[in-house]
């Protein structure tokens, strides 16, 4: 049976640095766009438990063992991330279901206030990003997630008791603060547990549960809409969804923070789990916040482009909040609107599945697959805009087609897992990306103004412009990755000593810019 052997060099970082005469020792003063360098000493060491597991240089394991470890990781980690992502999306969009059943009338809010609820949610999301990034690095990741799930679930439950707009606005802001860390945390988890070629499918998988949430949310909304009692149906929406989320959060008390601490793996399986991700060169957890790595994140061209892509792309999210109202405006009642919202979730899931299959076929091409999904969404927007009022069915199909774009967002997030190395840099990158994610989501609902009902044409036109911009950014980012990989190949050909290894350098919390052998996936 074929075996896989861990091959590491025991040469010291001091020896290797002396051979790299062209490399400067001062990171901040020497940083240039595109520069690849190694610091004179490793920036840090791997997690202490990981170092102990990695002590045996002659460790070997079989492909069958690797598959079994992957299966065990999938069995534990994927359901947790998928269901949590579904729950957080249900909590986030409960507002749109509640709006169908009289929430706006009972709480005396107008269309502007309703739009502001989405804006304030993402304002909370925005202000929490950098504090959450630092706390995420300092605290045990699983406990940190548990606390946030518990707190945002409580906010959702409390919305059922609201009797006016200001109370709803305040709770939405707090819910945004507590939900802010979930996607950045899942990006880090995916990077720590999975090989780079496995990451797109896993990211698409847990992101696809936004679509599952839309289907389940529509079913729940339809069922709760049939309740006619002393408590209004819209209040039951918040109560049921909030309690579901509250109960699920307890799971994170038992989830390991990284592979070296996984109780569901034996000692040998932990070592295999680490060896599987060695070639990622992105490390594990590191509790030390490194300002040099944070500085690098802000100047990295790929981070800038990913950040801009995300902010512009989120303008398309307005359709998620207003889809039920757009469908209702086509002539359907509240219950039928809830049911007809279900295909949006089904198309989102289909988009994730198709993208995942294509990613398995092509080693590179995530960004180009995303471009294809964006083009399908663009077609949906044009259908809503250009199809006449006399053809509501055509417009309905257009609304459904707007849900191809989330696959593009998920593929972009997988690039953070795959292409940003160093725990601080990855954490700061995720926070920065989600600051712009928040800005996009703050702007988006303001483009769907109450005076545009029921078509919201200006909002649809804004989506069309944003889709054209992100398609252009995707092509530029693809070109950058191809150029940077070829440049590194050339540097290694000119100076082979750049490719020599330090023992376990893959787990030493080095950034992608500090590793000449690092190659970007696109």
Swiss-Prot record:
Keywords: Endoplasmic reticulum, Membrane, Transmembrane, Transmembrane helix, Transport. PROSITE patterns: MFS (PS50850). GO terms for biological process: dipeptide transmembrane transport. Pfam families: MFS_1. It comes from the Eukaryota. Residues 1-20 are annotated as: Disordered. InterPro entries: MFS, MFS_dom, MFS_trans_sf. Gene3D superfamilies: MFS general substrate transporter like domains (1.20.1250.20). Its main location: endoplasmic reticulum. GO terms for molecular function: dipeptide transmembrane transporter activity; transmembrane transporter activity. The chain crosses the membrane at residues 69-89, 116-136, 141-161, 173-193, 204-224, 236-256, 303-323, 338-358, 367-387, 396-416, 428-448, 462-482. GO terms for cellular component: endoplasmic reticulum; membrane. Residues 1-11 have a biased composition (Low complexity). PANTHER family: MAJOR FACILITATOR SUPERFAMILY (MFS) PROFILE DOMAIN-CONTAINING PROTEIN, PERMEASE-RELATED. Belongs to the major facilitator superfamily. Allantoate permease family. This is Uncharacterized transporter C757.13. The lineage of its organism: Eukaryota, Fungi, Dikarya, Ascomycota, Taphrinomycotina.
């Amino acid at each position: 049976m074929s075996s896989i052997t861990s091959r590491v060099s025991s040469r010291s970082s001091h020896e290797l640095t002396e051979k790299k005469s062209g490399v400067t020792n001062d990171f901040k003063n020497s940083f240039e766009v595109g520069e690849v360098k190694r610091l004179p000493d490793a920036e840090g060491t791997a997690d202490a438990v990981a170092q102990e597991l990695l002590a045996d240089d002659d460790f070997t394991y079989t492909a069958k063992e690797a598959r079994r470890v992957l299966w065990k990781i999938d069995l534990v980690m994927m359901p947790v991330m998928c269901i949590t992502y579904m729950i957080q999306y249900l909590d986030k969009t409960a507002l749109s279901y509640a709006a169908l059943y009289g929430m706006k009338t009972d709480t005396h809010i107008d269309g502007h206030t309703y739009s502001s609820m989405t804006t304030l949610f993402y304002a909370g999301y925005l202000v929490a990003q950098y504090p959450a990034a630092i706390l995420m690095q300092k605290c045990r990741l699983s406990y940190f997630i548990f606390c946030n799930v518990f707190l945002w679930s409580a906010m959702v439950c409390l919305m059922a008791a609201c009797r006016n707009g200001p109370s709803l606005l305040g709770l939405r802001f707090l819910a945004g603060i507590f939900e802010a860390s979930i996607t950045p945390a899942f990006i880090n988890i995916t990077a720590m547990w999975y090989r780079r070629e496995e990451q797109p499918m896993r990211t698409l998988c847990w992101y696809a549960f936004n679509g599952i949430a839309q289907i389940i949310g529509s079913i729940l909304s339809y069922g709760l809409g049939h309740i006619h009692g002393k408590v209004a149906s819209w209040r039951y929406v918040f109560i049921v969804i909030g309690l579901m989320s509250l109960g699920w959060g307890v799971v994170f008390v038992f989830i390991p923070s990284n592979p070296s601490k996984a109780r569901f793996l034996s000692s040998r399986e932990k070592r295999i789990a680490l060896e599987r991700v060695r070639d990622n060169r992105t490390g594990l957890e590191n509790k030390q916040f490194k300002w040099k790595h944070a500085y690098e994140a802000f100047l990295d061209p790929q981070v800038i482009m990913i950040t801009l892509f995300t902010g512009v792309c989120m303008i398309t999210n307005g359709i998620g909040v207003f889809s039920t109202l757009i469908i209702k405006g086509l002539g359907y009642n509240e219950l039928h609107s809830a049911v007809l919202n279900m295909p949006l979730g089904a198309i989102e899931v289909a988009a994730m599945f198709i993208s995942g299959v294509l990613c398995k076929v092509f080693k590179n091409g995530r960004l180009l697959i995303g471009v294809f999904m964006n083009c399908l969404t663009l077609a949906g927007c044009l259908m809503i805009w250009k199809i006449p009022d006399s053809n509501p069915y055509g417009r309905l199909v257009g609304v459904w087609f707007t849900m191809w774009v989330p696959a593009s967002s998920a593929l972009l997030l997988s690039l953070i897992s795959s292409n940003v190395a160093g725990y601080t840099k990855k954490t700061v990158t995720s926070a920065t990306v989600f600051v712009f994610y928040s800005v996009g989501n703050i702007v988006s609902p303001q483009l769907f103004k109450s005076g545009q009902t029921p078509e919201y044409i200006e909002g649809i036109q804004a989506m069309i412009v944003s889709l054209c911009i992100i398609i252009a950014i995707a092509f530029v980012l693809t070109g950058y990755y191809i150029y940077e990989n070829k440049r590194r190949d050339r540097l290694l050909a000119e100076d082979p000593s750049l490719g020599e290894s330090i023992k376990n350098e893959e787990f030493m919390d080095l950034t992608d810019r500090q590793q000449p052998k690092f190659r970007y996936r696109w």
